[in-house]
Swiss-Prot record:
InterPro entries: Ribosomal_protein_uL29, Ribosomal_uL29, Ribosomal_uL29_CS, Ribosomal_uL29_sf. This is Large ribosomal subunit protein uL29. GO terms for cellular component: cytosolic large ribosomal subunit. The gene is rpmC. The lineage of its organism: Bacteria, Thermotogati, Thermotogota, Thermotogae, Petrotogales. Keywords: Ribonucleoprotein, Ribosomal protein.
Length: 66
């Protein structure tokens, strides 16, 4: 999901997406430990998406508009 698409979502939708991404990250890390993960760069992408969502939520909390 692109940052512009994320900014269009409501806080509730962003929190739901954040929870989904955290669950996905947990599953990817588990697969990595078991040696089942083929593409380890997917962990990096999920972590960046989590950071983007947290940034958007914090901007909204502080009243910063981009």
């Amino acid at each position: 999901m692109r940052i512009t698409e994320m900014r269009e979502l409501t806080d509730e939708e962003l929190n739901q997406e954040l929870n989904n991404l955290k669950e996905k990250l947990f599953q990817l890390r588990f697969q990595l430990e078991l040696g089942q993960l083929k593409n380890s760069s997917s962990i990096k992408q999920v972590k960046k998406d989590i950071a983007r969502i947290k940034t958007i939520l914090k901007e909204r909390e502080l009243g910063i508009r981009r």
